[in-house]
């Protein structure tokens, strides 16, 4: 790193009162710093440039406009949280976040879930709703790429998330850059879509925000990535979130979850609901066969999804009871949101493949309870 870059880092440290500035090891897998601190990066990713993002998202690119909204990466800063038990000996997941306001630190009540799922948090500062969308997207991409070179990260567990306007940014990255955010995304009280959607009464519509990405990327987003949509009963974006979730379902996205928090408005969800989203993202999945868009909206999703996920999970653990318990928790997420067909699919798989475990017995009882729903 050059002296000039180091000077910039020191300046950031002075400005970030109360936070610890530290460089993680340059090589992937380094132990790095733990706890909460601020980082800067000097190596900009090719995918974060204005031209690359505009091309990937199907947006026009005006040279004079690009110059106005572009950024110099060493001048930017990122808030990082690394769980205390990270040693660099095993791979962690990476949760790349985008806020609607200038700060990038994680809410304190989310840290337990981040620790539990062995995730590292990174979020750009000064990337709120008052900034153009392309640099916001670029900074999130730069965070994802640079953190993977500094920490031991599982590339299949790189997730993107955000709240409100940050959720909209995350939702575009989760689909448009599924080759980077291979684990998928968690879109909280805000999301965008690649197609215009009309409300059920036909009186309103929500315009398309971006274009479908290249076929290989789009297939990965539909078949391999997971996508969580979280809204609240009183969230102003609830209707749009519901429409877009149904659009994902229509287009055969195989691993999707809709969470609607009772009584919640346009605000951060509490720790319990944040944990529900992370739990779904972190459940292992297997690659399914190619999907095609139907001519009419299907009444149910494909029955192979839960079976594939369960099969993959079973290969990752030796304790059958533990695996069955994890799958039962996932089924409960569907039940909590009245997604009975998806829940039934997963419960049946548990009963058939984990006979003799407490979770199988509980799954059988639950199937009786939801019969006919």
Segments (PLM) and residue ranges:
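Short amphipathic alpha-helix adjacent to the substrate-entry channel of hydrolases
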Residues: 105-123
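The feature captures the conserved acid-bearing segment of alpha/beta-hydrolase catalytic domains
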Residues: 193-276
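Primarily recognizes the serine-hydrolase "nucleophile elbow" in alpha/beta-hydrolase
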Residues: 156-221
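Short solvent-exposed coil/turn linkers within tandem alpha-helical repeat scaffolds
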Residues: 251, 264, 351-364
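Short beta-strand element of the alpha/beta-hydrolase
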Residues: 90-101
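Gly/Ser-rich "nucleophile elbow"/oxyanion-hole loop immediately N-terminal to the catalytic nucleophile
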Residues: 84-90, 132-165, 170, 178-181
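A domain-start/cap signature at the N-terminus of enzymes
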Residues: 23-92, 246, 256, 290-297, ...
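Alpha-helical segment of the N-proximal tetratricopeptide repeat
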Residues: 322-349, 353
């Amino acid at each position: 790193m050059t002296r000039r870059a180091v000077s910039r880092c020191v300046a950031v440290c002075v400005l970030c009162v109360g936070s610890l500035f530290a460089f993680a090891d340059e090589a992937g897998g380094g132990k790095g710093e733990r706890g909460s601190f601020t980082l800067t990066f000097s190596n900009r990713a090719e995918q974060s440039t204005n031209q690359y993002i505009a091309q990937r998202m199907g947006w026009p690119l005006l040279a004079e406009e690009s110059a106005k909204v572009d950024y110099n990466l060493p001048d930017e800063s990122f808030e990082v949280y690394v769980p205390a038990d990270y040693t660099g000996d095993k791979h962690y997941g990476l949760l790349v976040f985008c806020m609607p306001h200038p700060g990038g630190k994680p809410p304190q009540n989310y840290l337990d879930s981040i620790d539990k799922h062995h995730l590292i948090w990174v979020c750009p500062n000064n990337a709120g709703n008052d900034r153009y969308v392309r640099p916001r997207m670029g900074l999130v991409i730069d965070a994802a790429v640079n953190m993977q070179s500094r920490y031991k990260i599982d590339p299949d567990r790189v997730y993107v998330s955000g709240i409100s306007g940050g959720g909209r940014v995350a939702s575009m990255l989760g689909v448009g850059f599924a080759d980077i955010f291979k684990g998928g995304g968690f879109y909280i009280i805000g999301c965008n879509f690649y197609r215009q959607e009309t409300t059920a009464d036909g009186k309103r519509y929500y315009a398309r925000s971006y274009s479908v990405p290249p076929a290989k990327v789009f297939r990965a987003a539909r078949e391999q990535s997971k996508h969580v949509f979280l809204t609240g009963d009183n969230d102003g974006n609830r209707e749009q979130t519901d429409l877009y979730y149904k659009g994902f379902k229509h287009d055969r996205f195989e691993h999707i979850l809709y969470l609607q928090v009772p009584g919640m408005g346009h605000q951060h969800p509490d720790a319990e609901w944040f944990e529900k989203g992370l739990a779904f993202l972190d459940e292992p999945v297997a690659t399914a066969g190619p999907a095609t868009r139907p001519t009419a909206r299907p009444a149910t999703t494909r029955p192979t999804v839960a079976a594939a996920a369960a099969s993959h999970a079973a290969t990752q653990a030796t304790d059958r009871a533990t695996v069955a318990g994890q799958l039962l928790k996932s089924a409960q997420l569907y039940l909590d949101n009245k997604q009975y067909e998806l829940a039934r699919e997963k419960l049946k798989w548990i009963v058939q493949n984990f006979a003799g475990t407490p979770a199988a017995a509980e799954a059988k009882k639950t199937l009786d309870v939801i019969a006919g729903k």
